[in-house]
Amino acid sequence: WRGEEGGIAAAKSGHDAIMSPTSHCYFDYGLDATDLKEVYHYEPIPAELTEEESKHILGGECNMWSERAPQELVDSKVFPRILAMSEVLWSSSEKDYDNFYSRVQKHYPKLDALGVNYGFESVPITSTVVFNNDSFYVSLFKGSPDMRLEYNLNNGTWQDYTTPFGAHSTTTLKARGFKNAKPYGEFEQELIRHIATGKKVNYIIPYNSHYQGTGDYNLTDGLLGSIENFRDGYYQGFSGTDMEVIIDLGQNTTFSNIETTFFQYYLSWI
C-alpha cells in the first residue's frame, strides 16, 4: 500500500507481495490525481527487481475506501478505472493506450444495461488562463478526444468552443461537455479582475516546490482555488516558514483593503 518500497523489499527478501501504490491504485482519489490513463500505465512489477525477484510479485490490487466517497459515488469512482487495472494485471507490459481507449468505449453499453453509474475517464474539462495586455486569455481542454465543448460568459448565450477567447473584466466562465450526444461534465471558473491582477510578485520567502500553484504570478493571476480540493493546482504553499511577498502595482495606487484566501485541512498537515 501507499508506495512500492514495501513490495520491493518483500520480493528482494524472498517473500510474495501484491502491489497497490496510491499513485495508481486508489480509486477513492479524484480523477485529477489518478485518471484512466494513469491507471493504465501502471506497471505492477518494479524495474528494480531481477527476473527471479519479480516472480514474488503476485499481482496488484485496487482500493475503494468508501468512507472517502458517498455510496452513490462509488460506481463512478470504480468504473471505468477498474477496466484499466484489469488490463494492466492480465496483459504484458507493452502499452497502447489509444487501442485500449477504443475498446473501453465498447464496454459502456453493457455497463448501461447493468445499471452501473460509471464516471469519467479523466477530468472532463480543464482550462489555462493567462492575464496579458489587460485581458484574460482562456483556453479550454477536453478530457476525451470524442467530446464537444460549449461555454458561456456571465450566464450569456452558450456557444461552441473552437478557439481560445478573451475576457476583459471580472467574469464567470461556465463550460459543459457532450460525448455521444450525452452531457459529459461541467466546469465553472471565476476570473477576478482587481488592481493587482497580473502584477509582479516578489517573494521574500520562496514558496515550497511541492506547492507551486501556477508559479510566480499565482497570487495575482485572478484565479481562486477550490474550497474543496487543495490539489487543484491553484494553491501555493509555504512549509515551515512564514509567507512574505511584495506585489509591485507599477505606480502609486490608493486602495482601502487587501483580501486573500487560505486553505486549512489538518488531516493533510495544512
Located regions from the model:
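Solvent-exposed segments in extracellular or luminal domains encompassing
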Residues: 163-172
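Short, exposed coil/turn segments at beta-strand boundaries within extracellular/luminal domains
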Residues: 180-187
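Short beta-strand/loop motifs in extracellular/secreted proteins, especially
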Residues: 145-149, 243, 256
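Short beta-strand segments within Ig-like beta-sandwich modules, predominantly Fibronectin type-III
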Residues: 155-162
